[in-house]
A protein has these predicted regions:
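N-terminal leader/targeting segments and the immediate start of mature chains
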Residues: 2-4, 8-118, 262-272
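Flexible, membrane-facing loop/turn or short amphipathic-helix motifs
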Residues: 93-102, 129-130, 208-217, 246
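Short, hydrophobic/aromatic-rich segments at coil-to-beta transitions
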Residues: 81-88, 116-124, 194-201, 233-238
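Gly/Pro-enriched, hydrophobic low-complexity segments
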Residues: 198-270
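Short, solvent-exposed aromatic-acidic interface loops
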Residues: 123-132, 151-152, 238-247, 269-272
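An acidic-aromatic
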Residues: 108-174
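Solvent-exposed helix/loop surface patches that form functional interfaces
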Residues: 159-195
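Extended lipid/amphipathic-ligand handling interfaces
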Residues: 71-77, 108-117, 136-141, 224-230, ...
Length: 272
């Protein structure tokens, strides 16, 4: 079995909720299935750079002479203190499978996460390379529900699955060590992505890449592009290219609505 075949739907969910995702994360979900209500989200708090969109400007101004090492250091501390976040992942290139049978490939992911261990998301996937569909998922503490693509009902995953949505923001294993241990950090420039952002590039060590992707990407240092908000020092977007079975897969992650209150509760339509 290949490395990509060792992960499962639970793992990709954890990656996004954390984000890169979720990279990703546990990596977005049950909006289409009505499993939760996010009426408390504040659109004016949007700081993320959603792939393929041009968000409204927040008028942030970045210092072109800023020290890239200091930018990343401040980002590490800011990400350490995150209590909630909305995330969106888009993936292109070689397929990344989320099941052990290598039948379900992840294309997109969108959801929310709150500490210490609540997440919900919607995954856009391709089944057997010819059927596009969406899967919902909800994780609360140690319990995880995944939607059935045929019935739309949620099913409780059996015990034994490794899902820790808080891992992405764990100060020991999540964003903070990834940022503090990046090598060859450079400030590429100042980009307008709904306001000015620091565009930083560096090399993420293999151990941290594996952590934030919950095992989807293994045994490789990865060049990573980050966009960091100059006022909050929060990461608003990340892009990277990984190699799985000698084929490239491209990941684009957007993080937004930090600190918002999200309603995450068990789905009502659960079958055993």
């Amino acid at each position: 079995m290949t490395d990509r075949g060792r992960s499962d739907a639970t793992a990709i969910f954890a990656a996004a909720a954390v984000g890169l995702a979720g990279i990703a994360l546990a990596i977005t979900l049950a909006i289409a299935f009505g499993a939760f209500d996010d009426s408390s989200s504040n659109p004016t708090a949007q700081l993320g750079d959603v792939p393929g969109t041009t968000p409204n400007s927040d008028r942030a101004v970045a210092d072109a002479s800023a020290d890239p090492a200091e930018i990343v250091r401040a980002a590490a501390e800011a990400m350490r203190a995150v209590t909630s976040v909305e995330f969106e992942l888009q993936r292109t290139g070689a397929p990344v499978f989320i099941d052990q049978f290598e039948a379900i490939a992840l294309d997109e992911l969108h959801g929310q996460f709150t500490v210490p261990s609540k997440a919900q998301a919607e995954l856009t996937v391709r089944i057997n390379d010819n059927l596009n569909t969406r899967l919902g998922a909800v994780a609360i503490d140690t319990e995880v529900w995944i939607s059935n693509p045929v019935t739309g009902n949620f099913e409780t995953l059996p015990t034994g699955y490794d899902l820790d949505p808080s891992k992405f923001f764990d100060p020991e294993n999540g964003w903070r060590p990834l940022l503090t241990e990046m090598r060859n950090v450079e400030l590429v420039g100042i980009d307008d992505r709904g306001g000015e952002r620091y565009h930083v590039r560096g090399i993420a060590p293999a151990a941290q890449v594996r952590e934030i992707t919950v095992g989807l990407v293994r045994d490789q240092d990865v060049p990573i592009e980050l966009w960091i908000h100059p006022a909050t020092s929060l990461v608003t977007a990340a892009e990277l290219t990984t190699v799985i079975d000698a084929a490239e897969s491209n990941w684009a992650l957007a993080l937004s609505n930090y600190g918002d209150s999200f309603t995450i509760k068990p789905p009502e339509n659960v079958t055993n």
